[in-house]
Amino acid sequence: MTAAAFLLAAAVVSAQQNRADAPLVVNVVNVLPVQGNIYMLVGAGANITASVGRDGVLLVDSGTAAMTGKVLSTVLQLATALTASPAPIHCVGMHCPGTPYGWSSPSINAIIGSPAPPKPIRYIINTSLDPDHTGGNERLSVLPAESKIVGVTFPPVGIAPSAIVLAHENVLRRMSEVPEGKKESPIPVGAWPTDVYHSASYKLSEFFNGEGVQIFHQPRAHTDGDSIVYFRYSDVISAGEILSMTSYPVIDAAKGGSLQGILDGLNHILDIAIPEFRSQGGTMIIPGHGRLCDTGDVANYRNMIAIIRDRIQDMIKKGMTVDQVKAAKPTADYDGLYGSNTGPWTTAMFIEASYKSLRAK
């Protein structure tokens, strides 16, 4: 990591530490260096994974539509900070490098020593079709030069004329579905994936920022189109909605999700990840929501899901109804960490979705 990039990320951490008692700041995209080429962007909806380097920028998920301007501004700042400029050259004269070839002069040296422009966003990989994962697709993937977003004028350099938006084919199928009684999908065409894969795994055809990028389809997990993205050299996994440190996993049964699929996805992540020592360090995992994780965190979350599954499955075998299962509180010892009685995904909703998923097996 360059000094400029370190200072950019450290400024966020320092500001948060110095204002520990201050009110929570919203509508801000924070940057967390993970390891290797990988950075975690927090505050734009779902967590965004960014690979930034010599080949440009690759994003895993794009956040909400409302935060697109802040995401782009943050990505451009990060890409600029990571563009290592040559050391300034002040030498002029016969003994300076390049003089025999006729290109040593104050003007030429200034050009050589100037920083390179930031590289463009070249890929966006969607781990699911949720709006907080795909909301920025349209404006981040195709953005005309000199456009203005939230009062910031972006130069022609650093903005891709067209980035590839990649996802599993089921994401495109569901985003392009036309609701009954309607003439077109409510999701604009510009937000749809431009490239899809349909196999159990997929990899970019060449190294990106000096490493291989591998994508795994996880069927019937949060939905039927979930992807896990693995950066092989940086040793970082982007887990999407399969892993959340702020809630129980969201099971969207209407879109092909299931509790067992979530559990299978967590086991898949643990199969890929290698800890450094005692399940700590080593492979780092970026969840769909919440803090950065290591193997131990994923294993604890997996164990929690397995225990709750077994409890609900046992209650189903005893003939208990969904209301009886809710009353029995099979999640009680984990509610302090992941439970909620309000918001878009409550504990009761998780229990009901798990019950229906296990009954359908």
Could you tell me what each predicted segment is?
Residues V31-T99, P106, S227-E241:
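Conserved beta-strand hairpin/beta-sheet module of binuclear metal-dependent hydrolase folds
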Residues M1-A11:
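Bacterial N-terminal signal peptides
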